[in-house]
């Protein structure tokens, strides 16, 4: 499934690294400037942000397409998860009962953005792997039959 592509020039390697790390740099800067008091962004920065940058940077040497899809998918899923989690939390606060405030650590008054992010990101990765294993070989075979 995973084959190392042909030798790349240093310019191609740098370009792949920049393409992989660009969405993280933009998200990090946006969090520092405008979104600094939000739940999911703070959680991501304090937990594994740098490790993910490093891991995807290394993966970009072996599988550049996967690394690009993973990085842009990650950023999109974080943004969607944060926004949907905040909307769900605000909506649940409007309809909360006193009993809901007692169990606020794991109930309808907790921020669901982390789980939304995780499910969306898992879906993005599964869809890419399915595309890479099933659809992409068919497209290549069809192009070869046509002589392109």
Language-model-derived ranges and their functions:
Residues 1-7, 137-148:
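Short, charged juxtamembrane terminal tails flanking transmembrane helices
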Residues 1-52:
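N-terminal signal-anchor transmembrane alpha-helix
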Residues 19-28, 55-58, 119-131:
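Hydrophobic core of alpha-helical transmembrane segments in multi-pass integral membrane proteins
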Residues 28-36, 77, 81, 85-89, ...:
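Membrane-water interface at transmembrane helix exits
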Residues 32-33, 56-65:
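Hydrophobic alpha-helical transmembrane segments
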Residues 33-45, 81-116:
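Interfacial non-cytosolic loop connecting adjacent transmembrane helices
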Residues 66-81:
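Central hydrophobic cores of alpha-helical transmembrane segments
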Residues 96-143:
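Alpha-helical membrane-associated segments of multi-pass integral membrane proteins
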């Amino acid at each position: 499934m995973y084959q190392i592509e042909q030798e790349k020039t240093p310019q191609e390697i740098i370009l792949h690294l920049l393409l992989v790390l660009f969405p993280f740099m933009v998200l990090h800067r946006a969090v520092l400037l405008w979104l600094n008091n939000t739940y999911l962004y703070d959680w991501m920065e304090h937990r594994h942000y740098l490790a993910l940058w490093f891991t995807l940077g290394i993966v970009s040497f072996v599988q550049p397409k996967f690394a690009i899809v993973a990085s842009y998918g990650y950023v999109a899923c974080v943004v969607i998860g944060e926004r949907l989690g905040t909307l769900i939390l605000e909506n649940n606060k409007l309809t909360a009962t006193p009993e809901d405030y007692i169990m606020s650590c794991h109930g309808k008054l907790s921020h669901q953005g982390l789980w939304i992010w995780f499910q969306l990101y898992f879906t993005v990765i599964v869809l890419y792997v399915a595309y890479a294993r099933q659809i992409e070989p068919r497209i290549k075979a069809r192009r070869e039959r046509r002589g392109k």
